[in-house]
Amino acid sequence: MNYLEFEVIWGVNNIYSILELKSKLIYEGIFKGKILETGCKEYSPLVPGDIVLGYVYGSRKVYIDKRVSRKNILWRYNRKVDLRQAIVSNVDNVLIVNSANFPEMKNFFIDRVLVVAEEQNIVPVIVINKIDKGISQRVEEFSEIYKNLGYRVLKTSVKTFEGIKEVKEILRNSRTSFIGQSGVGKSSLINLIDSRASQSVNEISEKYSRGKHTTVYSISFHSENWIIVDTPGIKEFGVETLPFENLKYYFKEFENFASFCKYKSCLHVSEPHCSVTNSLGNGISKPRYESYLKILSELKNYKNYAK
């Protein structure tokens, strides 16, 4: 049996569609045993972007033997099984898709993704979608906050095609994950960029009796120019792999003030003579600071599975 290297495209019920890296042929992969030993507790051992090694048997069938170490990972918390659940791995960019009006932008969600992206060396881009329906004042205000911090913010519409060219430029020659909550138009945006993605989603939905245009698991799409990963609508995004004392380094706006704090170990919470807390509303955004406090509290009470 040939022992080859593959990339995971998608999977359900421990049956995976995997791409052989040299021939670019699609194989069906399964675990030879009941589980794949990965050395950590998690709900889904394989996600799009994972590189695996396996033995070919039969006609395009593979026994998956090993998962290669991941360069990076994005994950969420699965409450049903009380475990972390990987979403995608080994990505270059993450596009954080939001609606310009409804559903309401969740700045706390954006801040969580930004922290993880920075910590995992993934380039984050904030996308404001559905701008043809108007942009709320709240969204405009947060867009300016993120722009002033140096984050790229794109405004897009699948109806007017605004911003689509810029999105394609980001995708070119890279692997990019689209992250966002349900209803923000994430999958519609992907389908406009690559029509083959829509066809693939429909075929998979029909095969597994899922609703069309509803992403219930991560799926990657390969083209000559890019690799796109569509992900399920996410309510809770995992951050708990980060040591709590390091969180402050991933809030860019703190950098210009932290050196003036009395204590080098200052966490910018209730310490005396803290330059960060003294600058709230004057260089430090209050909503961003509230996100910092929420995430910090979570990290101090992390789950063991996240380490």
Swiss-Prot record:
Enzyme class of the recorded protein, top EC level: hydrolase
Keywords linked to the UniProt accession: Cytoplasm, GTP-binding, Hydrolase, Metal-binding, Nucleotide-binding, Ribosome biogenesis, RNA-binding, rRNA-binding, Zinc
Entries under NCBIfam families matching the protein: ribosome small subunit-dependent GTPase A (TIGR00157)
Pfam family, one: RsgA_GTPase
Keyword Signal: no
Subcellular location as annotated: Cytoplasm
The protein, known as: Small ribosomal subunit biogenesis GTPase RsgA
One MF annotation (Gene Ontology) recorded for this entry: GTPase activity
Main location: cytoplasm
Subunit structure: Monomer. Associates with 30S ribosomal subunit, binds 16S rRNA.
Organism of provenance: Borrelia garinii subsp. bavariensis (strain ATCC BAA-2496 / DSM 23469 / PBi) (Borreliella bavariensis)
Cofactor: Zn(2+)
UniProt cofactor note: Binds 1 zinc ion per subunit.
